[in-house]
């Protein structure tokens, strides 16, 4: 008789909590997307909680999570804990309006997408255009959720810009600082 060992993350999932606690890559994004879709299938009306403690990561992997968050009918409650940096910031900010939280000691990082690429001059030109397009799209998403302009988001994110919980609330990344 084989016994299945339940992990703490399985237990959290039973409570409709999805934990994003590392750098975002394709494997993690697939797991997060699958969990959100599973919770949506279980109950398309009950809130889904996405806790974020992430340094960011792959933009395309993060956009898969973002698109899944927008696709499901559930409200997505986001909670920033520790840090929500880069793509983690985009996901934190993309939670359902008025259901975006940050813990009092968490930090948020807004910055430009990072890229490392090589190849022929034509390849580099193509990749540079792609990352500039991604920068603009991420700025559009953040602007639509914060009430800022795309231009303001792009200017503020031109260099690493760290926010305290209070500053993140004031900027519009989140709606509430969670103290309890």
UniProtKB/Swiss-Prot annotation:
Keywords: Cytoplasm, Hydrolase, Protease, Serine protease. InterPro entries: ClpP (IPR001907), ClpP/crotonase-like_dom_sf (IPR029045), ClpP/TepA (IPR023562), ClpP_His_AS (IPR033135). Belongs to the peptidase S14 family. The gene is clpP2. This is ATP-dependent Clp protease proteolytic subunit 2. It is found in: Cytoplasm. NCBIfam families: PRK00277.1, PRK12553.1. One of its GO terms (biological process) is protein quality control for misfolded or incompletely synthesized proteins. Fourteen ClpP subunits assemble into 2 heptameric rings which stack back to back to give a disk-like structure with a central cavity, resembling the structure of eukaryotic proteasomes. HAMAP family: ClpP. It comes from Tropheryma whipplei (strain Twist) (Whipple's bacillus). It catalyses: Hydrolysis of proteins to small peptides in the presence of ATP and magnesium. alpha-casein is the usual test substrate. In the absence of ATP, only oligopeptides shorter than five residues are hydrolyzed (such as succinyl-Leu-Tyr-|-NHMec, and Leu-Tyr-Leu-|-Tyr-Trp, in which cleavage of the -Tyr-|-Leu- and -Tyr-|-Trp bonds also occurs). Signal peptide: none annotated.
